[in-house]
Amino acid sequence: MREKIKLESSAGTGHFYTTTKNKRANPEKLEIKKFDPVARKHVTYKETKLK
């Protein structure tokens, strides 16, 4: 089953994206480069728990 996750910016701006992932197929934490509109550049987003 796909679970909801939060991708939080490593730039420290507080910006985040929400998405889903299959935890059985990909148990490791997701780390992806995406655009941060607050910092106005591409930064690394790391998976955190969605509360």
Curated annotation (Swiss-Prot):
Protein's UniProt keywords contain Ribonucleoprotein: yes
Region of interest called Disordered, as start-end residue ranges on this chain: 1-20
GO BP field: translation
PROSITE patterns: RIBOSOMAL_L33
This protein's GO CC annotations: cytosolic large ribosomal subunit
Compositional bias (Polar residues): 10-20
Domain of life: Bacteria
InterPro entries tied to this protein: Ribosomal_bL33, Ribosomal_bL33_CS, Ribosomal_bL33_sf, Ribosomal_zn-bd
One function term, GO molecular function aspect: structural constituent of ribosome
UniProt entry keywords in alphabetical sequence: Ribonucleoprotein, Ribosomal protein
Family indicated by similarity: Belongs to the bacterial ribosomal protein bL33 family.
NCBIfam families reported for this sequence: PRK00504.1 (NF001764), PRK00595.1 (NF001860), rpmG_bact (TIGR01023)
Protein name (Swiss-Prot/TrEMBL): Large ribosomal subunit protein bL33
Native organism: Nitrosomonas europaea (strain ATCC 19718 / CIP 103999 / KCTC 2705 / NBRC 14298)
Gene: rpmG
